[in-house]
Regions:
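Terminal RNA-binding accessory module
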Residues: 1-86, 90, 393-394
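Rossmann-like S-adenosyl-L-methionine
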Residues: 2-25, 33, 255-491
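Short, acidic/hydrophobic/Gly-rich beta-strand patch recurrent on exposed beta strands
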Residues: 37-42, 179-183, 251, 380
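Extended interfacial segments that mediate partner engagement and assembly in macromolecular machines
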Residues: 75-86, 95-222
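Short, solvent-exposed loop/turn elements at beta->coil junctions and helix N-caps
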Residues: 131-138, 224-227, 234-235, 471-475
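Short edge beta-strands and adjacent turn/loop segments
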Residues: 229-243
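Short, aliphatic-rich beta-strand segments
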Residues: 238, 244-253, 311-315
Length: 491
């Protein structure tokens, strides 16, 4: 067999399941975290991906622990009336979307409940008012950034294996290579994507053009072999804005000027609307480009997003919320919770490229923004400059090292603190400094309700602050991810 790696994986999976039962006629009763559904069997919780409440299924158990089990649908006996038809042919394989089979109203209901469970059960937080969850107007084609991986070894479907293995000659490299998303749990394989309904249609067009161009010239453009660390084509990043601008970043493993120039020239000619055509030579073991030099082949080194008359520059390394339209709704909630009157000194923690800082700057006296990434702070300063905003100051460094009592003494005590930390939440030292600063209001924006609940415990432990409002904002339809904004007021 030419493609033994796939059969090895199948045999390994079969061995793992050998002693685990197949449960028949199981009714799914609800939804759980991380995009899974659940039911209860003999006092244990059973988690099942891609199931819907009301489904009656035969379920193959894949993991069995003392308090819970995990399984996969072997057969849907009776589909739930809640089930909808997924829009994507890659659904259940790709791993990017977990809930395309559920109506959006049910997705929102589940996400809202996840937030409430986190605050009430994990944090034991008393919330004055839960405002209705803000759903996304766009549930398809809403992402402004997508990243794809070139791999010499793509995921092959059983029918593809049958065809290739029936041949007397080994498959050509282009028949095994792919450009798409990493499969969950399989670091060296990608799913060759035809259409991704998360990004703009032009993203599909550009990705398919690059894939077809390189696949037609396998000797010149070998796809990357992650295990052997060899090949040329590594990753492709695409970004778009609501203003119609497009950024393309092609990452090569090594320099090959002739091949690189030919590909980028072909891209430029086929898509003259590209605003920023960039490339990177990344010879490291991993795919991250944060520490790599960015080269501009054509156009600008950035694209611009617009929000409420403000323009924000976005570079290849910049963080910007991946749902532009819904980011505006998120920031409006944060600004509303800040209750600015024009006289306040605001601290914007984890400011990124200064989007929130600049968004609220015209409604307050001054803003101090702090962010770990120096390049992001440079973008934040530029964003203030291009928008004629002169009441912002930005500082780069580790939050717990920058935000100190001395820093606050130098820059003035904040009336309002807006904090939007990464998924890990805030360091305990940062929480302690916020409490010492004693702002009148704290607005906590979070992409992880569990760590937000943990931090809210610390912020409310002394009794100085109460949580007055909470509002979930859905930035990522068809996924389990959710943003939540909380207002704390000093008693």
């Amino acid at each position: 067999m030419h493609l033994s790696y796939h059969s090895r994986f199948t045999r390994q999976l079969a061995r793992k399941k050998k002693d685990l039962p197949l449960l028949e006629g199981i009714t799914i009763t609800g939804l759980a975290g991380e995009g899974k559904a659940l039911t209860h069997i003999d006092g244990k919780v059973l988690f099942v991906p891609f199931a819907a409440p009301g489904d009656v299924c035969d379920i193959q158990i894949t993991k069995k622990k003392s308090s819970f089990m995990e399984g996969k649908i072997a057969r849907i006996v009776t589909p739930s009336p809640e089930r909808t038809q997924p829009i994507c042919s890659h659904f259940t394989i790709c791993g990017g979307c977990k809930w395309q089979h559920l109506p959006y109203s049910l997705q929102l209901q589940s996400k809202d409940q996840v937030v409430r469970d986190a605050l009430q059960r994990i944090g034991k937080i008393e919330v004055g008012e839960y405002l209705p969850i803000l759903g996304s107007v766009e549930t398809e084609r809403y992402r402004n950034k997508l990243e794809f991986t070139f791999s010499h070894k793509r995921w092959l479907f059983p029918e593809e294996l049958d065809v290739l293995n029936a041949r007397s000659t080994p498959p050509e490299p282009y028949e095994l290579s792919g450009l798409g998303y990493h499969l969950p749990g399989m670091f060296d394989k990608v799913l060759n994507i035809d259409t991704c309904y998360l990004g703009a249609e032009v993203m599909d067009e550009i990705r398919l053009f690059v894939r077809d161009y390189c696949s037609a010239r396998p000797e010149e453009y070998p796809y990357f072999d992650l295990r052997k660390q060899e090949g040329l084509m590594r990753t492709l990043m695409l970004r778009t804005t609501s203003t119609g601008e497009i950024m393309v970043v092609v990452v090569f493993y090594r320099e090959d000027e002739a091949a690189r120039t030919a590909l980028l020239t072909a891209l430029q000619e086929r898509f003259p609307q590209i605003t920023a055509l960039l490339y990177v030579i990344n010879g490291k073991c991993n795919d991250t480009i944060g520490d790599q030099e960015i080269h501009c082949f054509y156009g600008r080194e950035y694209i611009e997003e617009e929000m409420e008359g403000l323009r924000f520059r976005i570079g290849p390394k910049s963080f910007y919320q991946t749902n532009s339209r819904q980011a505006y709704e998120l920031y409006k909630v944060a600004r509303e919770f800040a209750e600015l009157t024009g006289s306040e000194r605001v601290y914007d923690l984890y400011t990124g490229t200064g989007t929130i800082a600049n968004f609220v700057a015209r409604q307050c006296a001054s803003v101090v923004g702090i962010e770990y990434v120096p390049e992001a702070i440079e973008d934040a300063r530029v964003n203030s400059e291009v928008n004629g905003i002169d009441n912002t100051l930005f500082y780069a460094g580790d939050m717990k090292d920058i935000l100190t009592t001395d820093f606050i003494s130098e820059h003035g005590e904040p009336d309002v603190i807006i904090t939007d930390p990464p998924r890990a939440g805030m360091h305990e030292d940062v929480v302690a400094t916020i409490l010492r600063a004693a702002p009148r209001r704290i607005v906590y924006v979070s992409c992880n309700p569990a760590t937000q609940a943990r931090d809210l415990q610390l912020l409310t432990a002394t009794g100085e602050y109460s949580v007055t409002k909470s509002r979930a904002v859905d930035m990522f339809p068809h996924t389990h991810h959710i943003e939540n904004v909380v207002q704390l007021v000093r008693r």
